[in-house]
Amino acid sequence: PGERADVVCFPECYIPGYRSPSRPVPPPDAGFLERAWSAIAAAARRHNVAVVLGTERFVDGALRLTALVLNRDGTAAGFQDKVQLDPSEGSLYSPGSGRRVFQAGSLKFGVAICHEGWRYPETVRWAAQRGAHIVFHPHFHEAEPGSYRPTVFADPANSFHEKAALCRAAENTCYFASVNCASEGSPTTSAMVAPDGTLLAYQPYGQHGLLVADIDISKATGLLAARCRSPYEDS
């Protein structure tokens, strides 16, 4: 009570649910998606909050993983499709193309979806180089049989993923907000990382809830992203 969010970010494909061979989800339904988006847009307008919604959409008959960005008045700012698919996703989804920077008031932000933020750091740098103060990272990650079950963020014994989240912020001097569903034993959790790579907050593992974090956009200078000499040239 009393906490007031300016932007709410949901995990990857929160609507209708992340698809995988081991996770049955009802067949893609464009009508259902439109109704769900409309309901969430109405809630955004009612509460005057911007939304980054992990979802899916059809483009020219092909199904894409995407994030729908809603303005505070409930209007659609646009989509950021997942461009770099995980190798396991190729039979279920089609890759998107292009990247965008969005704005909510004075806050500029980008979106890198799951695999993109973990293994393609240039997706985060692209946004930071164009003025993004924060990159939202909706993802889906759940426990696999026999996998390590962490209790502390970025545990050295855990997989590389949460260490990568710290790097994405530090290497670009921007905030990085990684957002996952809460599930028992998941190797990653939702977290907010500061522009110097320090952890601001994280959700206890497996615990349902809403992680709320305050940020200071004056600290998100994008300094290190701007200093990157790119493209690299052969010597």
Map each language-model feature to its residues:
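Glycine-rich phosphate-binding loop signature in dinucleotide/nucleotide-binding domains
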Residues: 1-4, 130-131
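Short, conserved active-site loops that position catalytic residues or coordinate cofactors/metal ions
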Residues: 3-27, 138-142
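A cross-domain feature marking catalytic cores of carbohydrate-active enzymes
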Residues: 12-13, 55, 113, 139, ...
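CN hydrolase (nitrilase-like) catalytic-core segments centered on the catalytic cysteine
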Residues: 32-52, 118-209
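Short beta-strand scaffold segments in enzyme catalytic cores
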Residues: 53-55, 66-69, 100, 190-192, ...
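Active-site catalytic loop in hydrolytic enzyme cores
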Residues: 58-163, 222-233
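Hydrophobic residues at beta-strand termini and immediately following loops
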Residues: 80, 102, 179, 203, ...
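Juxtadomain coupling helices with adjacent low-complexity linkers
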Residues: 216-221
